[in-house]
Amino acid sequence: MLMRQKGIIIKAVDYGESDKIITILNEHGAKVPLMARRAKKVKTGLQAQTQLFVYGLFIYNQWRGMGTLNSVDVISQHYKLQMDLYVSSYASLAAETIERSMDEGDIAPYNYQLLQFVLEKIESGTSAQLMSVVVMLKCMKRFGFTASFNRCAVSGNDTQADLIGYSFKFDGAISRQEASKDVHAVILSNKTLYLLDVLQKLPIDKMNSLNIHQEIIDEMSDIILMLYREYAGMFFKSQKLINQLKRLEQ
């Protein structure tokens, strides 16, 4: 059966000498794996069209199991996401988070909206690292956990100015007054905790201007990755390249 669906490539894996297996997140919020034959060959024209983040109309044959890609009518190549290694790595982290949050057969229209929103924001100049944080905050429940940043997990104190870190012992933010009860709590700035809470709760269609200092973004990114490792046992492939790039800077 010949299928035509709009979608965004969220995963691309080399298969053999000349083929690729791509996964698109289609406009209905479903993951669709496709075999792209000879996609690594320049002459086929599919090499550029099967890159990560390509948004387009995908035409493919679907019978049982994996479909076979025929062609792609590209709507947006998202070139800016490919031009900078840092940008590309954090955009990949966002895409990987969404891809791994979904089981085979899942239908999640919100994930498609989230991915489109994030890629458009990055293209317009918003920090890709910040956008990866937004995605990971929005996808937490799909990985089976949540996190609270707006009140002390020990005392219930919800005075934002008193919160100084995150406690894995008590599974939540911890206040200055209770800090002695967990000497291993991850110390965070008050602003980091506040913004994590805001971004977690704020609908994406209300996120207009996102201007946050890099130090705060770094703190948010670090604690979010720690949460995913601790609560979901997740380590993302994209994170390996990010870690390598950070080591090169040191």
Curated annotation (Swiss-Prot):
Which Pfam family, giving just one, matches this sequence? Answer: RecO_N
Q: Which domain of life is it from?
A: Bacteria
Q: Which UniProt keywords apply?
A: DNA damage, DNA recombination, DNA repair
What SUPFAM superfamilies would the database entry show?
ArfGap/RecO-like zinc finger, Nucleic acid-binding proteins
Indicate yes or no for the key word RNA-binding.
no
Q: Which Gene3D superfamilies does the entry mention?
A: Nucleic acid-binding proteins (2.40.50.140), Recombination protein O, C-terminal domain (1.20.1440.120)
- Tell me the InterPro entries matching this sequence: ARFGAP/RecO (IPR037278), DNA_rep/recomb_RecO_N (IPR022572), NA-bd_OB-fold (IPR012340), RecO (IPR003717), RecO_C (IPR042242)
Keyword Protein biosynthesis attributed? no
User: Cellular component per GO?
Assistant: bacterial nucleoid
Biological processes, Gene Ontology terms? DNA recombination; double-strand break repair
State the similarity comment: Belongs to the RecO family.
Summary of the function given for this chain in its UniProt record: Involved in DNA repair and RecF pathway recombination.
Indicate what this protein is called per its UniProt record: DNA repair protein RecO
What is the source species?
Staphylococcus aureus (strain Mu3 / ATCC 700698)
Q: What is the lineage of its organism?
A: Bacteria, Bacillati, Bacillota, Bacilli, Bacillales
